[in-house]
């Protein structure tokens, strides 16, 4: 798994070629396996649980026994402790002390999309359609209007990045490749997940 790559296959996911020309937060892009080796801990485990990249730093500090509390530096600015981090240590999960540390995860493509993923559902909120709102639901992408259009199965360098007209809701239990948008069939679930997403982003104070 790497950053600059495109999904392989025969197009069975139905979302076109991706790379950097489309802000798709679909499963084939955001579901990234995490491999860890921690000296002194038994290996060979496969754990099915939600984690995020922000969990890496607290995990490493925990493994090095460097967890610490915030304090006053004595120079007029605070020294932040590990409890101030957005992430959580994965060691309790690795040791089998807990079954999960998160009920959901979020993903996104700067200025274009946010998504929230639970065990059963995946909700995608497309941002550019809300570009007139100056809040966390929108961020302009400079130069996007000058980019040239392209077909779904091409990936022209510098192509205009467009998003769907409405948000997406997928049932992860029955729709592995996220091809059947059920947002009109389950509007209550969509509203619930969008609310969870907004609350979480608001807590992060993220733009």
Regions found by a protein language model. Give the residues of each.
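C-terminal, low-complexity/hydrophilic appendages and adjacent surface loops
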Residues: 27, 108-183
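Generic structural signal for small/hydrophobic residues in well-ordered secondary structure
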Residues: 3, 33-34, 56, 90, ...
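Short beta-strand segments
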Residues: 1-2, 35-36, 104-109, 124-125
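Histidine-centered active-site microenvironments of extracellular/periplasmic hydrolases
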Residues: 1-42, 47-52
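Short, solvent-exposed loop/helix junctions and linker helices
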Residues: 29, 47-54, 84, 163-166, ...
């Amino acid at each position: 798994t790497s950053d600059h790559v495109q999904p392989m296959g025969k197009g069975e996911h139905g979302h076109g070629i991706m790379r950097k020309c489309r802000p798709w937060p679909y499963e084939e892009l955001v579901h990234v396996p995490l491999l860890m080796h921690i000296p002194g801990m038994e290996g060979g485990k496969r754990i099915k649980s939600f984690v995020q990249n922000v969990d890496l730093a607290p995990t490493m500090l925990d493994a090095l026994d460097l967890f610490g509390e915030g304090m006053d530096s004595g120079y007029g600015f605070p020294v932040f402790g590990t409890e101030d981090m957005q992430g959580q240590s994965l060691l309790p999960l690795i040791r089998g002390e807990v079954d999960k540390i998160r009920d959901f995860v979020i993903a996104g493509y700067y200025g274009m999309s946010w998504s929230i993923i639970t065990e059963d559902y995946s909700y995608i909120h497309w941002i550019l359609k809300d570009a007139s709102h100056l809040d966390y639901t929108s961020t302009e992408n400079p130069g996007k209007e000058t980019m040239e259009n392209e077909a779904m199965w091409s990936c022209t360098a510098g192509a205009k990045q467009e998003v769907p007209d409405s948000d997406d809701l997928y049932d992860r239990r029955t729709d592995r490749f996220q091809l059947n948008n059920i947002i009109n069939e389950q509007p209550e679930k969509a509203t619930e997940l969008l609310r969870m997403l907004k609350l979480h982003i608001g807590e992060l104070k993220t733009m």
